[in-house]
């Protein structure tokens, strides 16, 4: 409120200052409501328990990291995850059968194929919609090393399937050459690298490098968790990754960094108004609590949709959906409890270094 406005008010001449007074009143009221709301939303003390959350992250990641190390040592491909034919090259043969295939029957077929000289076959059951096909009950998908169509190896597989089932039908044969598989793998890694570089550049420009580094570590945290779970599933249930898995990882990275940016943006906004009244830890706590409901609600609505797809969708997209479910769940956790605590630790260290220098 300027001195001129004050004199005009006292003299009764306020007509030309009406708009200014109205704006000041609305601004003051909004600020007071904002302050009250921010005080009310402070519920969780994330900063106080930051080392507990970091320890929890380590507990979540260690089993998966151990599985990836073991897989790298033991797999013929020397990869931390069991890779499918999209990356190694290979052939998929699909046989339609007139009976439902149990897990025990699947195990018997796998043993028969291995005894017949087919190394490391990957078997998958695809249920057939009765409305689409009245004769076939299931489709048995067999992935193996690259074989030529009509070759002796394909005939060998067909003969084994003929001996295990009644009148099976070869419905589809598809192959990916080793060169194309390596090209797909290289392109996938380039896509991941470009995504990470773009995120670092954007966050550094919009915030500062500390925030960008925390966000990238959060993304590494999320990717390690998802890859670790799939490494364990590969060891226990022969789950293989393909191009859809990398697509899921890229989607998870985008979703997770979006959640992290929402928190960091609120921190930046609160620092403008409360940096002299509150410590950085208090501002971080307030910012997390103000965005907590939004983050959880957004993730829950997405997870409900993904769970419906997982249980009701087709088997061919199930691993993709599972990777999305795991990634969004851990991404929500990391944006709230992991990235924010890293920034707070670095801010404390900067403050300590500055005090020591003085």
Residue ranges and their predicted role:
Residues 1-4, 13, 17-358:
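A structural signal for conserved, well-ordered secondary-structure elements
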């Amino acid at each position: 409120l300027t001195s001129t406005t004050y004199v005009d008010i006292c003299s009764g001449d306020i007509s030309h200052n009406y708009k200014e007074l109205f704006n000041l009143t609305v601004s003051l009221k909004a600020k007071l409501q904002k302050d009250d709301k921010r005080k009310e939303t402070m519920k969780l003390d994330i900063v106080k328990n930051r080392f507990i959350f970091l320890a929890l992250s380590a507990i979540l990641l260690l089993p998966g990291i151990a599985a990836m190390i073991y897989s790298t040592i033991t797999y013929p491909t020397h990869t931390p995850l069991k890779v499918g034919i999209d990356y190694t090259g290979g052939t998929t043969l699909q046989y339609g059968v007139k009976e439902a295939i149990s897990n025990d029957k699947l195990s018997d077929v796998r043993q028969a194929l291995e005894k017949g000289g087919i190394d490391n076959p990957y078997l998958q059951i695809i249920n057939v919609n009765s409305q689409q096909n009245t004769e076939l009950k299931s489709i048995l998908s067999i992935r193996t090393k690259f074989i030529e169509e009509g070759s002796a190896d394909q005939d060998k597989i067909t003969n084994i399937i003929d001996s295990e089932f009644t009148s099976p039908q070869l419905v589809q044969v598809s192959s990916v050459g080793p060169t194309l598989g390596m090209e797909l793998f290289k392109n996938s890694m380039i896509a991941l690298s470009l995504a990470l570089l773009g995120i670092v550049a954007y966050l550094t420009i919009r915030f500062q490098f500390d925030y960008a580094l925390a966000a990238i570590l959060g993304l590494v945290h999320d990717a390690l968790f998802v890859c670790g779970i799939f490494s364990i599933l590969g060891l226990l249930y022969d789950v293989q990754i393909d191009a859809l898995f990398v697509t899921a990882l890229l989607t998870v990275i985008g979703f997770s960094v979006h959640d992290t940016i929402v928190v960091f943006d609120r921190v930046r906004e609160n620092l403008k108004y409360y940096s002299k009244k509150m410590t950085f830890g208090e501002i971080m706590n307030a910012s997390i609590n103000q965005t907590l409901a939004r983050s959880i609600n957004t993730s829950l609505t997405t997870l409900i949709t993904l769970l419906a797809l997982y249980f009701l969708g087709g088997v061919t997209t199930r691993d993709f959906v599972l990777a999305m479910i795991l990634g969004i769940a851990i991404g929500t956790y990391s944006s709230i409890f992991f990235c924010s605590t890293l920034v707070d630790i670095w801010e404390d260290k900067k403050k300590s270094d500055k005090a020591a220098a003085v």
